[in-house]
Amino acid sequence: MAAEKDQQKDAEPEGLSATTLLPKLIPSGAGRERLERRRATIRPWSSFVDQRRFSRPRNLGELCQRLVRNVEYYQSNYVFVFLGLILYCVVTSPMLLVALAVFFGACYILYLRTLQSKFVLFGREVSPAHQYALAGGVSFPFFWLAGAGSAVFWVLGATLVVIGSHAAFHQMEAVDGEELQMEPV
């Protein structure tokens, strides 16, 4: 039995991604599988932020080519940049934290209540989708006061600027087929 536990420990991944608590919080299913696929395709952060590989594109064609290739190559890294910007926005806005706490608190209360018995409102049983819509309706004034709309557009704008500038100015390694192309004389 002890040998089996040692084998399980050896089979577990090591490093930063192994110590992340997020995958343990997400139940198994499609969401967890998607997160695992994203984590598996993350490119090395050292090459992602290597300052020696940034330069201005020579022309519009090269700019477009860099945008397409970098977005395709660093797609998972860009997803985590987006999530980091969301986290930054939420952490730096205390009222938005309160609004999120109200929303998730209402969802949790509804969840606990449905475990005990069916949720009945005005003599009618309320479906789970309607319950979460009710939680959203209760927390909507808090989101409105917190300026959640402007936070959403800030995150989208900041994401476009950060990812767009990185994709436009980051040089990709030359692919073997591109090195062998001949220029017309």
UniProtKB/Swiss-Prot annotation:
Start and end residues of each stretch annotated as Homodimerization: 175-185
Membrane topology category: Multi-pass membrane protein
Topological domain ranges for the Cytoplasmic compartment: 1-78, 113-131, 166-185
Compartments where located: Cell membrane; Cytoplasm; Golgi apparatus; Cytoplasmic vesicle, Secretory vesicle, Synaptic vesicle
Record-linked InterPro entries: Prenylated_rab_accept_PRA1 (IPR004895)
Domain of life: Eukaryota
Span list, region Required for interaction with GDI1: 165-185
Annotated segments matching region Required for interaction with prenylated RAB3A and VAMP2: 30-54, 175-185
UniProtKB keywords: Cell membrane, Cytoplasm, Cytoplasmic vesicle, Golgi apparatus, Membrane, Synapse, Transmembrane, Transmembrane helix
GO CC terms, sorted: Golgi apparatus; plasma membrane; synaptic vesicle
Transmembrane segments: 79-94, 95-112, 132-148, 149-165
Biological role: General Rab protein regulator required for vesicle formation from the Golgi complex. May control vesicle docking and fusion by mediating the action of Rab GTPases to the SNARE complexes. In addition it inhibits the removal of Rab GTPases from the membrane by GDI1.
Subunit: Homodimer. Interacts with VAMP2 (synaptobrevin-2), prenylated Rab proteins, GDI1, NDRG1 and PCLO.
Family listed: Belongs to the PRA1 family.
Protein known as: Prenylated Rab acceptor protein 1
Species of provenance: Canis lupus familiaris
Gene name as annotated: RABAC1
